[in-house]
Amino acid sequence: MWGSRIAVALRILVVLAILPVFLLLVYSLPFVRPVSTLMVKDYALLQGVNRQWVDIENIAPVLVNSVMMAEDGQFCSHGGVDWHQLGLVLDDAGDGGPSRGASTITMQMVKNLFLWNGRSYLRKGLEFPLALIADAVLSKKRIMEIYLNIAEWGPGIYGIEAAARHYFKRSAAKLTARQAALLAVTLPNPALRNPAKPTRNMQRIARIVAGRAMRSGPYVTCVK
């Protein structure tokens, strides 16, 4: 009895391990429009989901640059995981310094696609191999496109097109530099941050991000 149960459990684990790889291969097709686990949950609970897919060519470049500078400045140069940044985070933790994140855009994408929210060592441990596989399977441009279309920008607001229209009454293609920066700094905490009604601290950070986006030329070539 126990032998058969173990065999079934192993088969399930194998399927769970293979499924994300298979889905990433499917998501490499440009006409496929992935959804996040949060979106699936909202659909299952019959809650409203505001998401309008938009190709990356129809997203203002200043938004792409702002998100990259705010979330993952080395996006074009790492292989899915920023090992240097991770090392700095571990050093800070060992020294008792303030905690900071080391999640790359690729890691955030796979978390949104396959995993769950909330702090968890298990979830973080799963992000690493999934991000490495995603970086090997998908182009940087496709990773950014998927990320910008599944990221949460507020309760029930998924993707940059829905966010741009909800907060600024315009398409993602027509965002200004200031609007792009405010949307970028909303990403770490969309439940509490409102880009249309930014706090002074949000405005301060957005100005920094906007400045970096203006000077981001060498860092964003992989999404051109």
UniProtKB/Swiss-Prot annotation:
DNA-binding as UniProt keyword: no
Reaction catalysed by this enzyme: [GlcNAc-(1->4)-Mur2Ac(oyl-L-Ala-gamma-D-Glu-L-Lys-D-Ala-D-Ala)](n)-di-trans,octa-cis-undecaprenyl diphosphate + beta-D-GlcNAc-(1->4)-Mur2Ac(oyl-L-Ala-gamma-D-Glu-L-Lys-D-Ala-D-Ala)-di-trans,octa-cis-undecaprenyl diphosphate = [GlcNAc-(1->4)-Mur2Ac(oyl-L-Ala-gamma-D-Glu-L-Lys-D-Ala-D-Ala)](n+1)-di-trans,octa-cis-undecaprenyl diphosphate + di-trans,octa-cis-undecaprenyl diphosphate + H(+)
Cellular component aspect of the GO annotation: peptidoglycan-based cell wall; plasma membrane
Primary subcellular site in the record, as a coarse category: membrane
Enzyme Commission no: 2.4.99.28
Pfam families attached to this UniProt entry: Transgly
InterPro entries xrefs: Glyco_trans_51, Lysozyme-like_dom_sf, PBP_transglycosylase, Pep_trsgly
Membrane topology: Single-pass membrane protein
Lineage top rank: taxon: Bacteria
Pathway connected to this protein: Cell wall biogenesis; peptidoglycan biosynthesis
HAMAP family with a match to the protein in the record: PGT_MtgA
Role: Peptidoglycan polymerase that catalyzes glycan chain elongation from lipid-linked precursors.
Family listed: Belongs to the glycosyltransferase 51 family.
Name listed for the protein in its UniProt record: Biosynthetic peptidoglycan transglycosylase
Origin species: Brucella suis biovar 1 (strain 1330)
The encoding gene: mtgA
